[in-house]
């Protein structure tokens, strides 16, 4: 089995991305490739990663403008990850995340299945005002009241076959590609890994190890920041110490 680490980034996050890549070089072992997807016209210093440059929709896509340029499109790219790597499994990692200790593909699996954390909405809705939007968008997307939130932390390993199955489901339900459906949604109308997690939990529960965090949270190997806040001196110092 082969495993790719996939990062969708853009120029504003390249400062974060440099730390993310340094952490991968330091701590990631046993992965076949690292794929960094960036917009056409942007550039990065030469690295060991395979860079893929893609065109992104412009201001004609109203929902993209409302989200900030490219926000919805990066969600679309992630749900098409199988088009950017031939590996059997894809590990999604955001630019503003760094690995904090050695990690291998086996660390992301339980009994040979990708580990996927989920938390009952009833336990967390009162703690985060944004989660209500996730419930509404998941209900609108699937027609089913969601029981769990599936975007608990980075990173997330997903089998290659799951992306095409998911896109087929979207077309069967909405008669639209995932891209067309997503770009037509309002602000916070797309929560891609919640959509995919809910779908896989319902249709393929025996192929993913879904873990209810009510029964404990496995140790994390990722430090996740909030890129919109910028790299503060405190965060920079913390990342530098981890990567020293």
Give the ranges of each region predicted by the language model.
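Conserved donor-nucleotide/metal-binding helix-loop-beta segment in metal-dependent transferases, i.e.
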Residues: 99-133
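Long, low-complexity C-terminal extensions of enzymes
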Residues: 216-244
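Active-site-proximal specificity loops/subdomain of glycosyltransferases
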Residues: 39-84
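Short aromatic/hydrophobic "clamp" motif used to bind/position activated sugar donors
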Residues: 90
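N-proximal low-complexity "stem/linker" segments adjacent to membrane-targeting elements
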Residues: 1-19
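Catalytic core and acceptor-binding pocket of nucleotide-sugar-dependent glycosyltransferases
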Residues: 143-227
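Short, acidic, metal-binding catalytic loop of nucleotide-sugar glycosyltransferases
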Residues: 22-31
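The conserved acidic donor/metal-binding loop of glycosyltransferases
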Residues: 94-98
């Amino acid at each position: 089995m082969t495993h790719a680490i996939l990062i969708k980034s853009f120029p504003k996050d390249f400062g974060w991305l440099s730390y993310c890549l340094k952490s991968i070089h330091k701590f990631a072992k046993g992965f076949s490739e690292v794929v960094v997807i960036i917009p056409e016209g942007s550039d990065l210093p030469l690295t060991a990663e395979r860079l893929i440059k893609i065109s992104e929709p412009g201001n004609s896509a109203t929902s993209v403008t409302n989200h900030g340029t490219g926000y919805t499109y990066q969600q679309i790219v992630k749900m098409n990850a199988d088009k950017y790597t031939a590996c059997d499994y894809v590990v999604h990692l955001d630019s503003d995340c760094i690995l904090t200790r050695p990690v291998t593909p086996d660390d992301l699996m339980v009994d040979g299945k990708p580990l996927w954390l989920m938390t009952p909405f009833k336990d967390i809705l009162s703690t985060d005002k944004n989660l209500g939007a996730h419930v509404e968008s998941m209900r609108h997307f699937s027609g089913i009241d969601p029981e769990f939130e599936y975007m608990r932390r980075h990173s997330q390993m997903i089998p290659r076959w799951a992306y095409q199955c998911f896109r087929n489901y979207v077309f069967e339900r909405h008669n639209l590609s995932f891209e067309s459906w997503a770009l037509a949604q309002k602000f916070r109308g797309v929560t891609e890994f919640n959509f995919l997690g809910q779908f896989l939990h319902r249709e393929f529960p025996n192929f993913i190890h879904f873990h209810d965090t009510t029964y404990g949270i496995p140790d994390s190997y990722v430090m996740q920041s909030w890129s919109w806040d910028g790299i503060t001196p405190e965060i920079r110092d913390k990342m530098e110490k981890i990567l020293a």
